[in-house]
Amino acid sequence: MTWLPLNPIPLKDRVSMIFLQYGQIDVIDGAFVLIDKTGIRTHIPVGSVACIMLEPGTRVSHAAVRLAAQVGTLLVWVGEAGVRVYASGQPGGARSDKLLYQAKLALDEDLRLKVVRKMFELRFGEPAPARRSVEQLRGIEGSRVRATYALLAKQYGVTWNGRRYDPKDWEKGDTINQCISAATSCLYGVTEAAILAAGYAPAIGFVHTGKPLSFVYDIADIIKFDTVVPKAFEIARRNPGEPDREVRLACRDIFRSSKTLAKLIPLIEDVLAAGEIQPPAPPEDAQPVAIPLPVSLGDAGHRSS
């Protein structure tokens, strides 16, 4: 019989991510394990991880997917080095009230503009220019992003020829583009886990639209130049033999030291609140969020259970 905790571990208290490759993922004696070709088992603490990135060479059993869903852990099927996302398994947190709230903000042009302006302000530390449309703000953002990449390249002494990479061919990109791709992939994974845990839809974006992870890109872009992208340039400067591995380890440390997972859901709520509309109350029979926060006693002298 599979043992499960009474409540999933809150997202903010979890390890950010784990990358797995070349093995069969299954549940044996109640444990989530990776079995390699020689039969060696590696235990994976599935309930204490925000998302598990599954690289080429992995096969996942029904029991493993079921256990991951029960403990609120996101499974993401990615390409080599995590530079391409093929699919993800939602851990069961989406709710109609949250989705309708998000969709209303995205479908109303005035509300959408308010949200985009808030994203701009959070990303660049200053209010968005007045009387600009979403398309115009997107253009201003793109120009600033290109300038930021060039500035980081100069700061770290890295040759920069622009953001150029082929997601179908990892080896084709130069070292800096490989590092950036690996870093942003890590950030996208934990951001998607946070969005799903909060009950929202990764596909309903505001700046980005028409992609399965549009909202993921929106939220991740707010913090990527304060977290993972500078580290990608720092690692690329050393020209390591395994840039993707070094970047992943560095990102994991950044997420832990900066408490990224603890900040993501409040950031998501702050961005959506810019629309200045009241979120609908959940129905009485609404499904609870995938990873609920522990109930506090309301006394600073007591710890929540």
From Swiss-Prot:
<comment type="subunit">
    <text>Homodimer. Part of the Cas1-Cas2 complex. Interacts with RecB, RecC, RuvB, CasC and CasE. Forms a hexamer with 2 Cas1 dimers sandwiching a Cas2 dimer. The DNA lies across a flat surface extending from 1 Cas1 dimer, across the Cas2 dimer and contacting the other Cas1 dimer. Only 1 Cas1 protein from each dimer is catalytic, the other interacts with the Cas2 dimer and possibly target DNA.</text>
</comment>
<dbReference type="InterPro" id="IPR033641">
    <property type="entry name" value="Cas1_I-E"/>
</dbReference>
<dbReference type="InterPro" id="IPR002729">
    <property type="entry name" value="CRISPR-assoc_Cas1"/>
</dbReference>
<keyword id="KW-0540">Nuclease</keyword>
<feature type="binding site">
    <location>
        <position position="141"/>
    </location>
    <ligand>
        <name>Mg(2+)</name>
    </ligand>
</feature>
<dbReference type="GO" id="GO:0003677">
    <property type="term" value="F:DNA binding"/>
</dbReference>
<keyword id="KW-0460">Magnesium</keyword>
<dbReference type="GO" id="GO:0046872">
    <property type="term" value="F:metal ion binding"/>
</dbReference>
<comment type="similarity">
    <text>Belongs to the CRISPR-associated endonuclease Cas1 family.</text>
</comment>
<feature type="region of interest" description="Disordered">
    <location>
        <begin position="278"/>
        <end position="305"/>
    </location>
</feature>
<feature type="binding site">
    <location>
        <position position="221"/>
    </location>
    <ligand>
        <name>Mg(2+)</name>
    </ligand>
</feature>
<keyword id="KW-0234">DNA repair</keyword>
<dbReference type="Pfam" id="PF01867">
    <property type="entry name" value="Cas_Cas1"/>
</dbReference>
<dbReference type="InterPro" id="IPR050646">
    <property type="entry name" value="Cas1"/>
</dbReference>
<dbReference type="InterPro" id="IPR019851">
    <property type="entry name" value="CRISPR-assoc_Cas1_ECOLI"/>
</dbReference>
<keyword id="KW-0051">Antiviral defense</keyword>
<keyword id="KW-0963">Cytoplasm</keyword>
<dbReference type="GO" id="GO:0006974">
    <property type="term" value="P:DNA damage response"/>
</dbReference>
<feature type="region of interest" description="Sufficient for cleavage of ssRNA, ssDNA and Holliday junction DNA">
    <location>
        <begin position="96"/>
        <end position="278"/>
    </location>
</feature>
<dbReference type="GO" id="GO:0006281">
    <property type="term" value="P:DNA repair"/>
</dbReference>
<comment type="function">
    <text>CRISPR (clustered regularly interspaced short palindromic repeat), is an adaptive immune system that provides protection against mobile genetic elements (viruses, transposable elements and conjugative plasmids). CRISPR clusters contain sequences complementary to antecedent mobile elements and target invading nucleic acids. CRISPR clusters are transcribed and processed into CRISPR RNA (crRNA). The Cas1-Cas2 complex is involved in CRISPR adaptation, the first stage of CRISPR immunity, being required for the addition/removal of CRISPR spacers at the leader end of the CRISPR locus.</text>
</comment>
<dbReference type="GO" id="GO:0099048">
    <property type="term" value="P:CRISPR-cas system"/>
</dbReference>
<keyword id="KW-0255">Endonuclease</keyword>
<dbReference type="GO" id="GO:0004519">
    <property type="term" value="F:endonuclease activity"/>
</dbReference>
<keyword id="KW-0238">DNA-binding</keyword>
<dbReference type="GO" id="GO:0005737">
    <property type="term" value="C:cytoplasm"/>
</dbReference>
<dbReference type="GO" id="GO:0008821">
    <property type="term" value="F:crossover junction DNA endonuclease activity"/>
</dbReference>
<keyword id="KW-0227">DNA damage</keyword>
<dbReference type="GO" id="GO:0043571">
    <property type="term" value="P:maintenance of CRISPR repeat elements"/>
</dbReference>
<keyword id="KW-0479">Metal-binding</keyword>
<dbReference type="GO" id="GO:0042803">
    <property type="term" value="F:protein homodimerization activity"/>
</dbReference>
<protein>
    <recommendedName>
        <fullName>CRISPR-associated endonuclease Cas1</fullName>
        <ecNumber>3.1.-.-</ecNumber>
    </recommendedName>
</protein>
<dbReference type="GO" id="GO:0042802">
    <property type="term" value="F:identical protein binding"/>
</dbReference>
<dbReference type="InterPro" id="IPR042211">
    <property type="entry name" value="CRISPR-assoc_Cas1_N"/>
</dbReference>
<dbReference type="InterPro" id="IPR042206">
    <property type="entry name" value="CRISPR-assoc_Cas1_C"/>
</dbReference>
<dbReference type="GO" id="GO:0051607">
    <property type="term" value="P:defense response to virus"/>
</dbReference>
<feature type="binding site">
    <location>
        <position position="208"/>
    </location>
    <ligand>
        <name>Mg(2+)</name>
    </ligand>
</feature>
<dbReference type="GO" id="GO:0017108">
    <property type="term" value="F:5'-flap endonuclease activity"/>
</dbReference>
<keyword id="KW-0378">Hydrolase</keyword>
